[in-house]
Amino acid sequence: MEARNQTAISKFLLLGLIEDPELQPVLFSLFLSMYLVTILGNLLILLAVISDSHLHTPMYFFLSNLSFLDICLSTTTIPKMLVNIQAQNRSITYSGCLTQICFVLFFAGLENCLLAAMAYDRYVAICHPLRYTVIMNPRLCGLLILLSLLTSVVNALLLSLMVLRLSFCTDLEIPLFFCELAQVIQLTCSDTLINNILIYFAACIFGGVPLSGIILSYTQITSCVLRMPSASGKHKAVSTCGSHLSIVLLFYGAGLGVYISSVVTDSPRKTAVASVMYSVFPQMVNPFIYSLRNKDMKGTLRKFIGRIPSLLWCAICFGFRFLE
C-alpha cells in the first residue's frame, strides 16, 4: 500500500524486542526484574547518602543526583513497555511518544552533563586536594547542577519540539520498546534536512562539550598521577576515580554500541537489543559499580540495610496506633 502524508496521527506502534506471544511472559518477568533492581539499587544509594552525614560531600552529592537520574530515566521507558506487554497492546499515543522522547532526551542529557561535573570534581580532588573544599563549595556544586538542568532542558525541547513540524506516513511502526527520536524521524514523509542538522548540532554542542570536559579532566588527572612519587598515592588516586571512569565508559560505550549497531545492521531486532544496553543496563549496573568499589559506600549501605527491619517495625507500630 502506498504511503500517504498524514499530518494528524493518533498513535505509533512499539514493536519491542520479541513478537512471539509465548515469550512475552518471559520478557515481562525479565524487564520487571531489571527495573526493580534498578529502582532498589539506586534508591539505596540515594537514601544512604541522605542518611549518613559523612557522605555529605560534593562527590556523593553528585552520586545521589546520578542515582536519581537513573531512576527517572528507567521509569521513562520500562513501565510503558511492561504495560504494553501485559495488555498485549503495542501502541503509544502521539502525545505520549513525544513526551517520552522529550524526557529521554532530558534525563540522558542531564546524566551526560552530570558525568562531566563529576569528572571535574575528581580532577579537583586529585590534582588540588588541599584546595578541594574551597573550590568544590556548595555554591559551585549547585551552579553545576543548575547549568546541567538548563542545558538539558534546551536540548530536550529543541530536539523533541521539532517533531511537531513533521508529517508522518502510514507506516508508524517503531522497532524499539520506547520512542526514540532517530527512529521516529525515519517514519516521516517530510523533508528531514533541518531535523538532521539540528540533531548533529545538538550532538556536537550538548554532547561534545561535556565529553570534552571529561576527557580534559582525565588527561589532567593522568598527568598528575604520573607525577606522584609514591605508589600508594597513585593507587589511592586511581581508586578515587575508578568508579566514575567505569560509569563513563559504560555510558558512552553503550551509546556508541547502539550507533554502530544501527549503522552496520539492517535488522530492527538487533537495533532493539542494542538499545536495551543503552537505556536499561547502565542504570541497573551503576549502583553496583559504586557500592562494590567504594569502602565508605559499602559501610554506609551495611548500616542502612541493617536499620531497615527496625524502621519497618516502627512504621508498622505507627500504622497500628494511627488505626486505633
From Swiss-Prot:
> Which family, according to the similarity comment?
Belongs to the G-protein coupled receptor 1 family.
PROSITE patterns, A to Z: G_PROTEIN_RECEP_F1_1, G_PROTEIN_RECEP_F1_2
Which UniProt keywords are listed? Cell membrane, Disulfide bond, G-protein coupled receptor, Glycoprotein, Membrane, Olfaction, Receptor, Sensory transduction, Transducer, Transmembrane, Transmembrane helix
Residue spans, topological domain Cytoplasmic: 47-54, 121-139, 218-237, 293-324
Disulfide feature = 97-189
The gene coding this protein: OR7G2
Species of origin reads Homo sapiens
Please give the name of this protein: Olfactory receptor 7G2
Give the Gene Ontology MF terms in alphabetical order: G protein-coupled receptor activity; olfactory receptor activity
Q: Tell me what topology the record assigns in the membrane.
A: Multi-pass membrane protein
Q: Name one GO cellular component term.
A: plasma membrane
